[in-house]
A protein has these predicted regions:
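Short amphipathic alpha-helix that is part of the acyltransferase structural core
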Residues: 1-45, 50, 55-57
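Secondary-structure boundary elements
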Residues: 19, 33, 59-63, 131-140
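A short, polar/charged loop-to-alpha-helix boundary motif
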Residues: 38, 70, 74-86
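Conserved beta-strand in the GNAT
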Residues: 57, 63-73
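Short loop segments at secondary-structure junctions
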Residues: 60-63, 108, 184-188
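Acyl-donor binding region in acyl/amide transferases
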Residues: 84-178
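C-terminal "cap" of GNAT-fold acetyltransferases
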Residues: 172-200
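Short, cationic low-complexity segments
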Residues: 198-214
Length: 214
């Protein structure tokens, strides 16, 4: 699936070699180089979630990757969250849910607004997540978010309607507390239609600046 934007920013969602390679580059630049959370050479292809994942990659200036997230589809052995918590605490969400992992934006683009990304690269990635949930019929979106890290989007996610499940765990990559969040897709759409904020108007899948390809 391709979300194509006219003014130099485009976002692709796939498991193509190009998207996975650019996701890997961002993992290395952000999670390894900037924060020291991953080892040199960490590769999305090397873990057990890769074969049932899609990678959203935002690119600008003819191809520079500036943001990414991974969308994992449910299957045995579950999600990263269930690896940490077990399946019992969130079992009702698993059969028709997706998990969002490894959302990151290159440092120099975190606070930038572009004509085609009025809420920044993070806003584009959130929109991708909603579009994908609707496209595949996912009823729930699971996510986790560091509670005490300044760049974490916990406040923004809760403002969109994500709710804390009451469960948390220590992230193995940095020993920080991660809060497990959940949103029902139909509730997310309802929220965006009921509360017509600028961001919600941007999120609703009725955007002439975006072309979706399958």
């Amino acid at each position: 699936m391709m979300l194509q934007r006219a003014d130099g920013l485009f976002t692709s969602v796939s498991r193509s070699d190009a998207d996975v390679s650019d996701a890997k580059a961002l993992w290395q630049d952000v999670y390894c180089g900037e924060f020291g959370w991953l080892g040199v050479g960490s590769d999305p292809r090397a873990d057990k979630y890769h074969q049932r994942s899609l990678y959203a990659v935002c690119r600008v200036n003819g191809g520079l990757p500036v943001g990414t997230l991974r969308i994992v589809h449910e299957d045995d052995p579950g999600f990263y969250i269930t690896e940490k918590l077990g399946t019992a605490p969130i079992s009702r969400y698993l059969s028709k849910g997706i998990e969002v992992q490894r959302l990151m934006v290159r440092k120099e683009f975190r606070d930038r607004r572009l004509p085609e990304a009025p809420f920044g690269i993070y806003g584009v990635l959130v929109k991708v997540c909603l579009y994908h949930a609707l496209a595949v019929g996912a009823e729930w979106v699971l996510a986790d978010c560091h509670r005490d890290i300044d760049i974490g989007p916990l406040k923004s996610m809760k403002a969109m309607g994500f709710e804390e499940t009451g469960h948390s765990y220590r992230d193995s990559i940095n020993d920080e507390e991660c809060i497990v969040l959940i949103i029902e897709t139909k509730q997310w759409i309802s929220n965006t239609l009921r509360n017509r904020s600028r961001f919600n108007k941007y999120l609703v899948p009725d955007d002439p600046a975006i072309r979706m390809e399958t």
